[in-house]
């Protein structure tokens, strides 16, 4: 049921695409047994940035669906001998790769990939601080699994480094599309970067931001994307914005705590909140299920 050739950004997805992917993901969450729906398909993972959860989720998904899964080690590839990224992509296409999963630190790089791989399917696994659509789909599927099919009217609070977060941007676009109220908690130094079109409220107070929240989505400080001095020190950030049990007591009893990872314990989330939040582990499991669903939907 090939419905989608390129998954580059949230806007790439129709409502039908999203609904089918979420439905498939929920099925795969309930039944994680391997199958051969992608037998004979070749998928290449091309990651120019470090990754644990996203890369592992794709590799597990690819192999459990019967695909030939190849992860190109950039450090040992011909790119270290001077081969251009464009030539590497053209080589993958010529070798008959069916789908390329790409992560890059450069915003918009995914569009250059599309130009080089012809009819090959492409998935954006994160490009700079631009978008991370598969993580947003994971988060949406998790919220729906825990809160029900319709998220219209839910209060979703996103807290942290909005300025550098591709996860936040994709989630704002996706969740607001289905009627969720997006509230942002961020230090003043990052508030200017918040896109007003997808946001209901911006505050610099964690307590104010979470008091009516149905979902709290925490983001780490992305030091690797900061040039020069940090906008805010880790100590100052943790004093004002770390979610601990005392602050969490302000929120609703049934609030969902989410984090795309990696978590920086003691900075944006305390040990006790991290260890008690079963929804964060569900989010990780859903990450594999969603990647299975996406691959099945695009290649199955």
Curated annotation (Swiss-Prot):
Q: Does the keyword Transferase apply?
A: yes
Please provide, alphabetically and separated by semicolons, the GO molecular function terms listed in this UniProt record. amino acid binding; aspartate carbamoyltransferase activity
One family from Pfam that matches here is OTCace_N
Q: Which residues bind carbamoyl phosphate?
A: 53-54, 103, 132, 135, 261-262
- Pathway stated in the Swiss-Prot or TrEMBL entry: Pyrimidine metabolism; UMP biosynthesis via de novo pathway; (S)-dihydroorotate from bicarbonate: step 2/3
> Which keywords accompany this UniProt record?
Pyrimidine biosynthesis, Transferase
EC numbers: 2.1.3.2
This enzyme catalyses: carbamoyl phosphate + L-aspartate = N-carbamoyl-L-aspartate + phosphate + H(+)
In which residues is L-aspartate bound? Answer: 81, 166, 220
Q: Its Gene Ontology biological processes?
A: 'de novo' pyrimidine nucleobase biosynthetic process; 'de novo' UMP biosynthetic process; amino acid metabolic process
Q: Which cellular component, as a GO term, is one annotated location?
A: cytosol
Q: According to the UniProt record, what class of enzyme is this?
A: transferase
- Please verify whether the record's keywords include Cell cycle: no
Question: Which family does the similarity line name?
Answer: Belongs to the aspartate/ornithine carbamoyltransferase superfamily. ATCase family.
Q: How does it assemble?
A: Heterododecamer (2C3:3R2) of six catalytic PyrB chains organized as two trimers (C3), and six regulatory PyrI chains organized as three dimers (R2).
Function of this protein?
Catalyzes the condensation of carbamoyl phosphate and aspartate to form carbamoyl aspartate and inorganic phosphate, the committed step in the de novo pyrimidine nucleotide biosynthesis pathway.
The name of this protein is: Aspartate carbamoyltransferase catalytic subunit
Source species? Anaplasma phagocytophilum (strain HZ)
Query: What gene name does this entry carry?
Result: pyrB
């Amino acid at each position: 049921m090939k419905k989608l050739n390129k998954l580059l950004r949230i806007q790439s997805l129709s409502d039908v695409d999203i609904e089918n992917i979420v439905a498939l993901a929920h099925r795969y969450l309930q039944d994680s047994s391997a199958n051969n729906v992608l037998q004979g398909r070749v998928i290449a993972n091309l990651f120019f940035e470090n990754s644990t959860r996203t890369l592992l989720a794709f590799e597990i998904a690819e192999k459990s669906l019967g695909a030939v899964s190849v992860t190109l080690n950039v450090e040992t590839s011909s790119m270290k001998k001077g081969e251009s990224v464009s030539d590497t992509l053209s080589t993958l296409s010529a070798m008959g790769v069916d789908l390329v999963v790409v992560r890059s630190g450069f915003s918009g790089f995914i569009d250059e990939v599309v130009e080089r791989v012809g009819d090959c399917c492409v998935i954006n696994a994160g490009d700079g601080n631009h978008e991370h659509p598969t993580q947003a789909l994971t988060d949406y599927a998790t919220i729906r699994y825990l809160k029900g099919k319709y998220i219209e009217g839910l209060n979703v609070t996103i807290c942290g480094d909005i300025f550098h977060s591709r996860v936040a941007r994709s989630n704002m676009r996706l969740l607001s599309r289905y009627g969720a109220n997006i509230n942002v908690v961020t230090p003043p130094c990052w508030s200017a970067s918040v896109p007003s079109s997808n946001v209901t409220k911006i505050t610099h107070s964690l307590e104010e931001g979470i008091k009516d929240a149905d979902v709290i989505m925490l983001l780490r400080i992305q030091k690797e994307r900061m040039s020069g001095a940090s906008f805010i020190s880790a100590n100052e950030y943790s004093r004002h914005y770390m979610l601990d049990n005392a602050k969490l007591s302000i929120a609703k009893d049934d609030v969902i705590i989410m984090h795309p990872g990696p978590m920086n314990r003691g900075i944006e989330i305390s040990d006790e909140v991290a260890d008690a939040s079963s929804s964060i582990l569900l989010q990780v499991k859903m990450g594999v299920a969603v990647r299975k669903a996406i691959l099945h939907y695009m290649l199955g």
